Amino acid sequence: MARIASVNIPDNKRLVVSLTYIYGLGTTMAKTICKKAKILEDKKVKDLTDQELISLRNIIENEYKVEGDLRREVTLNIKKKKDIRSYQGLRHIRKLPVRGQNTHSNARTRKGKAVAIAGKKKAVK
């Protein structure tokens, strides 16, 4: 397995697909990285030479924020919004959807498991 940005990427997959295993790289960005490195997108990772792997590593590490750096930046941005008490920060604090989604009937993944309301006991006739 090749190791890029401290992530083991699978050998038996195409380069574009295996680059998406890195947090912060999608298919579009993986294709642009392949073009910059002048490597065919359809090439399997196991067929890459050491020089090609080194060029991929250099491009990813020097030009893009991936993995730990990106995760850290995202969490700091969320923390900053919470600290300045912006609307989005308040939604994060309350664990509600941040970007204007409806919460009346949806948002179960964000709000957590539904808590049943204890109903009144029916009187026995």
UniProtKB/Swiss-Prot annotation:
Located at the top of the head of the 30S subunit, it contacts several helices of the 16S rRNA. In the 70S ribosome it contacts the 23S rRNA (bridge B1a) and protein L5 of the 50S subunit (bridge B1b), connecting the 2 subunits; these bridges are implicated in subunit movement. Contacts the tRNAs in the A and P-sites. Part of the 30S ribosomal subunit. Forms a loose heterodimer with protein S19. Forms two bridges to the 50S subunit in the 70S ribosome. GO terms for biological process: translation. It holds the Pfam family Ribosomal_S13. PROSITE patterns: RIBOSOMAL_S13_1, RIBOSOMAL_S13_2. Belongs to the universal ribosomal protein uS13 family. Keywords: Ribonucleoprotein, Ribosomal protein, RNA-binding, rRNA-binding, tRNA-binding. This is Small ribosomal subunit protein uS13. InterPro entries: Rbsml_uS13_C (IPR027437), Ribosomal_uS13 (IPR001892), Ribosomal_uS13-like_H2TH (IPR010979), Ribosomal_uS13_bac-type (IPR019980), Ribosomal_uS13_CS (IPR018269). PANTHER family: 30S RIBOSOMAL PROTEIN S13/40S RIBOSOMAL PROTEIN S18 (PTHR10871), SMALL RIBOSOMAL SUBUNIT PROTEIN US13M (PTHR10871:SF1). One of its GO terms (cellular component) is small ribosomal subunit.
